[in-house]
Amino acid sequence: MGITGMIYMVPMVFSLIVLISCSSTMGYNYFQFTQQYQPAVCNSNPTPCKDPPDKLFTVHGLWPSNDVGDDPIYCKNKTIKSQQIGNLTAQLIIIWPNVLDRTDHVGFWNRQWNKHGSCGKAPTIKDEMHYFKTVIKMYITQKQNVSEILSRAKIEPEGKIRRRDDIINAIRLGTKDKKPKLKCQKNNQTTELVEITICSDRNLTQFIDCPRSSFKGSPFHCPTNHILY
């Protein structure tokens, strides 16, 4: 590359640095607590899951988010060792497994922390261990387990065709009448329910209506009827 080419490259590199910097330092105004249905995750992935999935919704992640504009990502970069997680490991493997590769749970938790959790701010999210403890508290203690919420509404993972409103209304019953966000994936001739997201305020003190939903025409849009779960 000649000098002229290098001169033209400088603004591009600078712009990229600014973009990354802004993305990692911006604030957020709510949290998404996203849980994924294991069989649907395996069915929608190009590479088969290494182990049979459980018929459960387990944690995908807890994500600081914005109702308008981009969400913050990669605010810090820190590798977490398995020994640091210590006695939390047994609980995390149950509620937050790496569904695609169960030999790499710690790698999955690292990716979720670095991309999303690291952008949380104290006192809501103080550090990586507090992030993991917060997720355990939400899923187990505060009963934000989507599988249990659906089960209380008599919606079980039986491979039946469901109505979107029935699923949404069931989640509303468990979240003080706040609207969740659904993600579906078309698989051959059926549309499977892949994820359900519960939203909370930026302090994780109360549920809110999820601001964003997949629009009609999106590959992740859930139809009014004919959702497999």
From Swiss-Prot:
Keywords: Disulfide bond, Endonuclease, Glycoprotein, Hydrolase, Lyase, Nuclease, Signal. Residues 1-27 form the signal peptide. The N-glycans attached at Asn-188 and Asn-203 consist of either monosaccharide (GlcNAc) or disaccharide (GlcNAc-GlcNAc) that could not be distinguished. Disulfide bonds join 42-49, 75-119, 184-222, 199-210. This is Ribonuclease S-6. It comes from Pyrus pyrifolia. PANTHER family: RIBONUCLEASE 3, RIBONUCLEASE T2. Self-incompatibility (SI) is the inherited ability of a flowering plant to prevent self-fertilization by discriminating between self and non-self pollen during pollination. In many species, self-incompatibility is controlled by the single, multiallelic locus S. Belongs to the RNase T2 family. It is an enzyme of class 4 (lyase). Its EC number is 4.6.1.19. One of its GO terms (cellular component) is extracellular region. The active site is at residues 60, 112, 116. It catalyses: a ribonucleotidyl-ribonucleotide-RNA + H2O = a 3'-end 3'-phospho-ribonucleotide-RNA + a 5'-end dephospho-ribonucleoside-RNA + H(+). InterPro entries: Ribonuclease_T2_eukaryotic, RNase_T2-like, RNase_T2-like_sf, RNase_T2_His_AS_1. RNA binds at residues 36, 60, 98-99, 108, 111-112, 115-116. Glycans are attached at residues 77, 87, 145, 188, 203. One of its GO terms (molecular function) is RNA binding. One of its GO terms (biological process) is RNA catabolic process. Pfam families: Ribonuclease_T2.
